């Protein structure tokens, strides 16, 4: 009997350990309770997505783990090309083969990249081993001396979740700083070794790299963060079992960097660097995310942020953990001065799975009484919303006309009382671009300017009208024409009227929250028409785009730069 009990206990223990193993799930990534580890499940490294990604209890903690030429990479640096991805469920391993370079992007493409002159392939393997994972990296060519310590495996740590939070490296402790701080260190740039891989590439090196001395986002590795710490064992969030990750290196040191030093949108970086001659066995990490076995994603209830017109369809969406099967009945409450009243409660429609989650739909279209409402699903609640006939009358499309479009107006000074959104800008527009070049952000210039102006000529009359592209300094003609058309149709078809802004096109002054008795929509139509007509008058045709000639000017952090744009065509 004792032997039977001991055997049963051993069996239960084995079953418990197996339940705590990292296994590849049907979606093709590792899962263990509330811990998920993706290996190139998606590929968008410019946006800090892809590569090795660690998600603990619904929150992304680290991402974009891959081989890089830089300590902290920005969106303008060369990226590898993925050759293959194998999900080996039998061996509980995911293998990805990549290579530097991607020749189609060297000196060419939507955003031309500049690759160093070292061509190699590599394989990243991640294998689930009980309650931890083993990551290895093997190169197919030895690292040259000139890239020793430059090439390495980077894992980016999400800064928004870490500011003010602690870390431990071996016996050293620290706290992630809210603001990027020195010391910095200088080193030779990879741009001293640009390869010659694409004879058809038409990017202009002088325009991209300028004098190679002043700061330039194209050169990301000459002044960087000095390491915050170095060691063999790193613990992220040691104070929080829901977010704790331990990483040990069995090959070389781990180094912790602040990637915000050389990129404003940089992340913290945990890195293993490759010495000269490194080939096979470049990296071996033991990754131990803390596993919360019984964790479940808390339901999220989403209704329309705008609210609903009484006569329209009304459906709330409920997002659940895929493992949830005991569905509750959603409930709709009406909120009044004397409290809340249950209006409707019934089983939701089972919509199905999408990516990591399961979805239900709760239809309450038949509810038409005006007022404040909220959808509840157990303890989860939607934001409070309105059902009303005037639900679109304020604070919806009006915000675009009142704030977004005025702030984006080019060639103007935009004030909001004693705030200056941006000063007079781009009054030097514009100079004709070179021919036969591949510029940034999708702009190219063909073999002809298609007008009387030649490369380098000043084209008069273009310093009027237009809106900056969202986040960048360029005027795309289709955006200018399209926005002006949309606003004109809103006026003609719906009689749309809003007047909260003064716009003086002669003085080039915009005053937000200072009505001038004119329809703001029509004034914005005029702003779009001004740039289009000015281009036609100057060129005898539409321009393709007016944009800044350098990367630093093109994607500014503030709106105070005065720049010299160029005209480009596709």
Regions found by a protein language model. Give the residues of each.
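Extended, loop-rich substrate-binding clefts of extracytoplasmic carbohydrate-active enzymes
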Residues: 71-142
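An acidic-aromatic substrate-binding cleft motif
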Residues: 296-310, 383-477, 482
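Well-ordered alpha-helical scaffold segments within catalytic/enzyme domains
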Residues: 316-318, 377, 473, 484-515, ...
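Ligand-binding face of N-terminal immunoglobulin V-set domains in extracellular IgSF glycoproteins
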Residues: 310, 346-388
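Conserved small/polar residues in nucleotide/adenosyl-binding loops
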Residues: 560-566
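Beta-strand-rich N-terminal accessory domains
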Residues: 20-89, 187-214, 221
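Acidic (Asp/Glu-rich), glycine- and aromatic
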Residues: 134-184, 379-391
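Beta-strand-rich recognition/accessory modules
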Residues: 215-295
